[in-house]
Regions:
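A short, Lys/Arg-enriched amphipathic alpha-helix followed by its capping loop at the start of a domain
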Residues: 5, 17-26
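Glycine-rich FAD pyrophosphate-binding loop
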Residues: 10, 22-42
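Central helical "cap/lid" subdomain
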Residues: 39-40, 121-188, 196-198
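Helical element adjacent to the flavin cofactor pocket in flavoenzyme catalytic cores
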Residues: 84-137, 141-142
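Beta1/beta-strand and adjacent pyrophosphate-binding region of the FAD-binding site
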Residues: 1-13
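Dinucleotide-binding Rossmann-like beta1-alpha1 core, especially the glycine-rich loop
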Residues: 34-92
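C-terminal catalytic lobe of FAD-dependent flavoproteins
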Residues: 221-248
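Conserved FAD/dinucleotide-binding core of flavoprotein oxidoreductases
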Residues: 146, 186-221
Length: 248
């Protein structure tokens, strides 16, 4: 008997889950607003995806100015005691093209997407609820807060971020395939990255700052960890889907 998986969300994480299920011979349905995600700034794959041309690999140079402790304090203040990316990632490591992979996945799985709103309980549509409960497995890549229940705890940090969407543009005046992390007081930003021609510049968020540190910068909430019983029988994937730092 063929097993069936219901996948919630059609961003990169959702369509990667669909690709994995399809490779395993499962039938699948994808539920989401049928809108392709816009990928901003320097994002990339840390591993290739089987049976997809993901470009590369290209070697990323990852440099830290200052110490991991200084970097942790600059980005998170006293609110985070876990590791930071300069500790988690090798100084030089390979990267594959996320945008190229997502373009392929969208062309492959766009016809499988059921266009619908995914609303929190108890507002979820009866049709979607029934479809989920008839499935052998539910994979949720939508923000985990959608399923939050009273007493759940979601930890996060705010940052300012400025990401380009044009490979011919660029914000970071640095070589491609480089990431610079800065824990020193010399500059106000903490990370400048340029990968596959796309750049991201990030600053720590301070409540006292009245204006963005640069024109176009926006406030971004970055998940750290959560303690949640909501939708405990689902598999939660993606950084916002799992609400966990280090999950991409």
């Amino acid at each position: 008997v063929t097993k069936h998986v219901a996948i919630l969300g059609c961003g990169p994480a959702g369509l990667m889950a669909a690709h994995a299920a399809n490779m395993m011979g499962w039938s699948l349905s994808i539920y989401s607003k049928k809108v392709k995600s816009t990928l901003h700034g320097a994002q990339y794959l840390h591993k290739p995806i089987p049976k997809i041309d993901t470009g590369g690999p290209n070697l990323v140079s990852y440099k830290l100015r200052g110490t991991p402790e200084e970097y942790r304090s600059k980005v998170y203040g006293e609110g985070w005691d876990g590791t930071v990316s300069p500790e988690d990632l090798a100084e030089n490591h390979p990267a594959w093209d996320l945008r190229q992979a997502y373009d392929w996945l969208w062309k492959q799985f766009e016809p499988w997407i059921v266009d619908c709103d995914i609303k929190p309980m108890p507002y979820i549509s009866p049709n979607l609820w029934n479809a989920m409960h008839k499935s052998d497995l539910v994979i949720s890549t939508v923000p985990r807060k959608v399923w939050a229940q009273e007493g759940d705890l979601f930890e996060s940090t705010k940052i300012w971020a400025l990401g380009d969407g044009d490979p011919d543009g660029g914000l970071a005046s640095q070589h491609d395939f480089t990431v610079i992390c800065d824990g020193t007081p010399i500059c106000n930003w903490y990370r400048s990255a340029k990968i596959f021609g796309h750049s991201t510049l990030e600053w720590p968020y301070r409540e006292l700052w009245r204006k963005p540190p640069a024109p176009g910068a926006v406030i971004v909430e970055k998940p750290l960890r959560c303690s949640s019983i909501g939708a405990g029988d689902f598999i939660h994937m993606g950084r916002y889907g799992a609400w966990e730092k280090g999950i991409l």
